[in-house]
Amino acid sequence: MMERFEKIEMKIPAKAEYVAIIRLTMAGVANRTGFAYDDIEDMKIAISEACTNIVQHAYKEDVGEIAIVFGLYEDRLEIMVADNGVSFDFNNLRSKVGPYDISKPVEHLPENGLGLYLINTLMDDIQIMHDEGMTVLMTKYIQREQVENDGNPISTYNSY
């Protein structure tokens, strides 16, 4: 039996001025799903980076579309960001990025690839598929319990 979930789909022009719409939509969906503020902020950065990569790399001269699908599950939010443009080799780029080395001057930071490193760091799971374009599937699990200073768990659920 398939796991039940709700799906929200959107398409926007692959232009920088539309990325904020996706970020705000994702924040609303994540808030409704029960995510903590810090997790929502992390997901906002991750989805912004994924969309910005498409805007910068996928469509050279043409203006294409970004397709976004939110999968709302009981324990997680899956976010798929896809394009039909030119792919780049994520695994090759991923191998070139990593944690910031404090001993290196700021001038030596890589210009490209830091966004993918951020996505990988901020999300619980990330999968990349190269077909006709590129699809990024990001997953964030809901942390239902948090611990107060005295060590007692508190629920993030509203108690209405």
Curated annotation (Swiss-Prot):
SUPFAM superfamilies: ATPase domain of HSP90 chaperone/DNA topoisomerase II/histidine kinase. The keyword Nucleotide-binding applies. Keywords: ATP-binding, Kinase, Nucleotide-binding, Serine/threonine-protein kinase, Transferase. GO terms for molecular function: ATP binding; protein serine kinase activity; protein serine/threonine kinase activity; sigma factor antagonist activity. InterPro entries: Anti-sigma-factor_SerPK (IPR050267), HATPase_C_sf (IPR036890), RsbW (IPR010193). It catalyses: L-seryl-[protein] + ATP = O-phospho-L-seryl-[protein] + ADP + H(+); L-threonyl-[protein] + ATP = O-phospho-L-threonyl-[protein] + ADP + H(+). Pfam families: HATPase_c_2. It comes from the Bacteria. Gene3D superfamilies: Histidine kinase-like ATPase, C-terminal domain (3.30.565.10). Its EC number is 2.7.11.1. Belongs to the anti-sigma-factor family. Negative regulator of sigma-B activity. Phosphorylates and inactivates its specific antagonist protein, RsbV. Upon phosphorylation of RsbV, RsbW is released and binds to sigma-B, thereby blocking its ability to form an RNA polymerase holoenzyme (E-sigma-B). NCBIfam families: PRK04069.1, rsbW_low_gc. This is Serine-protein kinase RsbW. The lineage of its organism: Bacteria, Bacillati, Bacillota, Bacilli, Bacillales. The gene is rsbW.
